[in-house]
From Swiss-Prot:
UniProt name for this protein: Protein FAM43B
Gene3D superfamilies: Pleckstrin-homology domain (PH domain)/Phosphotyrosine-binding domain (PTB)
Segments of skewed composition (Basic and acidic residues): 320-329
Domain of life: Eukaryota
Region of interest: Disordered: 245-329
Species for this entry: Homo sapiens (Human)
UniProt xrefs under InterPro entries: Adapter_Engulfment-Domain, FAM43A/B_PTB, PH-like_dom_sf, PTB/PI_dom
Gene that produces this protein: FAM43B
Membership in a protein family: Belongs to the FAM43 family.
Biased composition (Acidic residues): 264-279
PANTHER family registered for this protein in UniProt: PHOSPHOTYROSINE INTERACTION DOMAIN-CONTAINING FAMILY MEMBER (PTHR11232), PROTEIN FAM43B (PTHR11232:SF34)
Coiled-coil residue windows: none
Length: 329
């Protein structure tokens, strides 16, 4: 990584032997002080000269910028479906299945890199199908989806982790992945480092959430109080430091595409009408009627028209009492 792209400081041990500051070629502070005190023995203090000479020593320290992500050479053994997301011993059955299927001599040689965003694995050898310059695609396991990691108890060199895969229709599948390392202490160190990275990322995520919630509450208080001034924008330094590796990935398949929201057609029509009135300069009188008609049309359905009512039958004439008496005569 280029030195001007690095931003984190990692303190390294002090230099074992620091060079003395020199005044001129062949002359140093310590030699000048020792010669001066030897010439004037009455000025000698009770402390030894070595202790007095430490005052003039340089206190420089070595600093390493942005420590590189640790990389391990592993053999990927495979994965198996599991029903347990976390807990002691939740990977024993899955690792047993993977070990019985692959064995100690199997697996694919890969480079495992543990970074702030999770685990990244890339094959070491070049793929024959991709040509001489082609490489197999790398596999990334995001930190928020890793639910558990451990060094297996029965196989100390095996490092296993449970990953939450997302299938179609938002279905979740838990799979246990296992890799084989060269030494048992490397597997334990890798598990410990991954847990520390996840804990630090989750702490940063909670801190940023608290900051955003507090800012939202202040904004709501100002709006409720009727204050004209709004909350000032966050400084640039805070915005740059607000990058968190524990941000949960979006649920969409594209991973990063913004969610689509519903379009308010009435508001857009009102805005367009306002713009036309401002451009034309003459208000339209039929605007309320047009809007009411449009609302009524939206409520109408596309079903067929209702069946017409049956035709009215002619009313039969009934004879009155006089006609009945005449008919009886």
């Amino acid at each position: 990584m280029l030195p001007w792209r690095r931003n984190k400081f990692v303190l390294v041990e002090d230099e074992a032997k620091c060079k003395a500051k020199s005044l001129s070629p062949g002359l140093a502070y310590t030699s000048l002080l020792s010669s001066f005190l030897r010439s004037c023995p009455d000025l000698l203090p009770d402390w030894p000269l070595e202790r007095l000479g430490r005052v003039f020593r340089s206190r420089r320290q070595k600093v390493e910028l942005n420590k590189e992500d640790p990389t391990y050479t592993v053999w990927y053994l495979g994965n198996a479906v599991t029903l347990h997301a976390k807990g002691d011993g939740c990977t024993d059955d899955a690792v047993g299945k993977i070990w019985a299927r692959c064995g100690p001599g199997g697996g694919t040689k890969m480079k495992l890199t543990l970074g702030p965003h999770g685990i990244r694995m890339q094959p070491c050898e070049r793929s024959a199908a991709g040509g001489s310059g082609g490489r197999r695609p790398a596999h990334a396991y995001l930190l928020p989806r890793i639910t558990y990691c451990t060094a297996d108890g029965r196989h100390p060199r095996v490092f296993a982790w449970v990953y939450r895969h997302q299938a179609r229709h938002k279905a979740v599948v838990l799979r246990c992945h296992a890799v084989l390392l060269a030494r048992a202490h490397k597997a334990r160190a890798l598990a410990r480092l991954l847990r520390q990275t996840a804990l630090a990322a989750f702490s940063d995520f909670k801190r940023l959430q608290r900051q955003s919630d507090a800012r939202h509450v202040r904004q709501q208080h100002l709006r409720a109080g009727g204050a004209a001034a709004s909350v000032p924008r966050a400084p640039l330094r805070r915005l740059l430091n607000a990058k968190c590796a524990y941000r949960p990935p979006p649920s969409e398949r594209s991973r990063g595409a913004p969610r689509l929201s519903s379009i308010q057609e009435e508001d857009e029509e009102e805005e367009e009408d306002d713009a036309e009135e401002q451009e034309g300069g003459v208000p339209q009188r039929e605007r309320p009627e047009v809007l009411s008609l449009a609302r009524e049309l939206r409520t109408c359905s596309l079903r067929g028209a209702p069946a017409p009512p049956p035709p009215a039958q002619p009313r039969r004439w009934k004879a009155g009492p006089r006609e009945r008496a005449g008919q009886a005569r």
